[in-house]
Amino acid sequence: MEATLEQHLEDTMKNPSIVGVLCTDSQGLNLGCRGTLSDEHAGVISVLAQQAARLTSDPTDIPVVCLESDNGNIMIQKHDGITVAVHKMAS
């Protein structure tokens, strides 16, 4: 699985508008990251996804957390126990 995850991280970073990507487990353990998102962000990203999920009563509704700034967006979503964050530059 680790090699597959590493390949997905590399493939994601090939998009010129993406400057960072991070995958974390539900405990906030960094599973892999590239670019602007690093190990120090893993816990916060995991907690943001968990808290967003608590805002809905529908367990099939998987929220996307979007942090917006003048410099770009960080989109965070949890799937099957893995939370993915993508940092995309503003176009």
From Swiss-Prot:
Residue runs in coiled coils: none
UniProt cross-references to Gene3D superfamilies, sorted A to Z: Dynein light chain 2a, cytoplasmic (3.30.450.30)
Record's keyword terms, sorted: Acetylation, Cytoplasm, Lysosome
Assembly behavior: Homodimer. Part of the Ragulator complex composed of LAMTOR1, LAMTOR2, LAMTOR3, LAMTOR4 and LAMTOR5. LAMTOR4 and LAMTOR5 form a heterodimer that interacts, through LAMTOR1, with a LAMTOR2, LAMTOR3 heterodimer. The Ragulator complex interacts with both the mTORC1 complex and heterodimers constituted of the Rag GTPases RagA/RRAGA, RagB/RRAGB, RagC/RRAGC and RagD/RRAGD; regulated by amino acid availability. The Ragulator complex interacts with SLC38A9; the probable amino acid sensor.
The protein's name in its UniProt record: Ragulator complex protein LAMTOR5
SUPFAM superfamilies found in the cross-reference section: Roadblock/LC7 domain
Superkingdom in the source lineage: Eukaryota
UniProt subcellular location: Lysosome; Cytoplasm, Cytosol
GO biological process: cellular response to amino acid stimulus; negative regulation of apoptotic process; positive regulation of TOR signaling; positive regulation of TORC1 signaling; protein localization to lysosome; regulation of cell size; TORC1 signaling
PTM annotation (N-acetylmethionine): residues: M1
One Gene Ontology CC term in the entry: cytosol
PANTHER family hit by this protein: RAGULATOR COMPLEX PROTEIN LAMTOR5
Similarity comment: Belongs to the LAMTOR5 family.
